[in-house]
């Protein structure tokens, strides 16, 4: 379960503090999915970074399962990210010195859940079979996005945070990725929180909320 309570975040600017998130409350049960929508600059990506423990809120609390993020130190947060969550952000952060096949397995191996059969299934579903021996610099943006998604899914995370995971994909590949995400939700207790601008993508998930001016509506 993911539970966010009264979360607030501001950033300093020359004109003074800029409120980005104002009193966000959000709850997701294990195995559920939520599409987070809203205009650019509304705080969607900031919310995902806070939930991932990559930034600190000014106030409020975030609880994932038994973990309260505001009570964890950097080492504990890093271990939690490795073992329990999958991240697909707009910066794909693939490891340049590793081939695609090793990038795919990297997160799962760190989490101690590397499953060659599941990885093979992901490779087939994401259309990566011909790319396994390539390095990230040899891939297009859309190909890198598919690898990043495969890496996040390979460990069957308890919580998957995805920021525009289909943004660089054509419609056919986007539909295949969504089918794969829904399949993962059916087969595992993974909880999905996805940022998307696409009404078509959001409509495939169980629930939708809109973030506007730092508040959920």
Model-derived features: positions:
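ABC family nucleotide-binding domain
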Residues: 2, 7-211
